[in-house]
From Swiss-Prot:
Pfam families xrefs: Myb_DNA-binding
Keyword line: Nucleus, Transcription, Transcription regulation
Domain of life: Eukaryota
Species of the source: Arabidopsis thaliana (Mouse-ear cress)
Protein name from the UniProt record: Protein RADIALIS-like 4
Entry's localization field: Nucleus
Length: 77
């Protein structure tokens, strides 16, 4: 999930889930994609949805480039 530290609005866990489901439903070739995603989330503007997506992409790129260490999970054995 995208960090909200630079976002102009806060996102609830429910809104994040709706956002993720809408991204899966409306791919990059969908006409009026961002408007449809904003409607699916509800309470967010098209610009807020685009910004949230940009933050998500940046987070994914940071993780994939190794900027964040992999979590160390406790062994349960």
């Amino acid at each position: 999930m995208a960090s909200s530290s630079m976002s102009t609005s806060s996102w609830t866990a429910r809104e994040d889930k709706q956002f993720e489901m809408a991204l899966a439903k409306f791919d990059k070739d969908t006409p009026d994609r961002w408007q449809k995603i904003a409607r699916a989330v509800g309470g967010k503007s098209t610009e807020e949805v685009k910004r949230h997506y940009e933050l998500l992409l940046r987070d994914v790129n940071d993780i994939e480039s190794g900027r964040y260490p992999q979590p160390r999970y406790r062994n349960t054995n």
